Each structure stands twice: as C-alpha cells, then as structure tokens.
Amino acid sequence: IFIGGFSQGAIISYKLALLYPSKFEGIIIHSARLPIEYSVKEPSLYKNLNILIIHGSEDSGLSTKWAYQGKALFEKLGANTDYYEAKIGHEMNEDTYSKIRQWLLALVDK
C-alpha cells in the first residue's frame, strides 16, 4: 500500500506512517511539515518503509526547514528516505509529478 498527499494531506500521511509503519510500502510527502503531535514506534518497524519527501525551495507558506525535519526523523528511524527539492512554491508541477512517478516505478519494479 502506498499513500501520500500534498500539504495537509501529506501531514495526515506523515501521521499514518508514524502510527502504522509496517502497513505501508511507501509514503509520498509533498510540501508538508510533521504533525504538531506525534509519537514513534520501535525504530525497527520503519526499516521497510520507503518515503519520498518533496518540497519547494520557494515555498513561502512552509519553509524547507519543515521538510528537513521530516527527512531527519525518518532517516533516524531507519526508513528508506528520499528527498527532492524543486524550484517551486507551495505547489506541484510536472517536475514533481515526474519525480513521484519515477520513485513509484522504481519501487514497483524491485
């Protein structure tokens, strides 16, 4: 199962990944921050979780520091974490759609 979202939808995806790490093959986070309140499970439960974090370097609503925090947390937990920073604001574009597509195909083809 793969889940993901943009902005607030991605915050929900973060929350689900933190609560149920072994339920998902992959999580796609686009332009989001970690939930305000969250807890983590035993780190070994995250080792098979794949996470793609995408953030716009020109996002005026959510600074890239939020993306870096999410990246650092999931790396610390041992998840397979990929980060991509696009030269966009708080939006999606063909570049980010393409990145998501490539990431998903690479995992499905394993």
Describe these PLM feature segments:
Residues 52, 65-110:
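C-terminal catalytic histidine-bearing segment of alpha/beta-hydrolase fold enzymes
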Residues 15-19:
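Active-site signature of alpha/beta-hydrolase-fold catalytic machinery across serine-
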Residues 4, 28-31, 54, 86:
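Alpha/beta-hydrolase-fold catalytic nucleophile elbow
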Residues 52-55, 59:
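Short beta-strand/loop motif that positions the catalytic acidic residue
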Residues 22-35:
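A conserved short beta-strand
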Residues 4-9, 13:
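Gly/Ala-rich beta-loop-alpha elbow adjacent to hydrolase catalytic centers
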Residues 32-51:
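Flexible "cap/lid" loop of the alpha/beta hydrolase fold
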Residues 40, 64-65:
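Conserved catalytic-core motifs of eukaryotic protein kinase domains, centered on the activation segment
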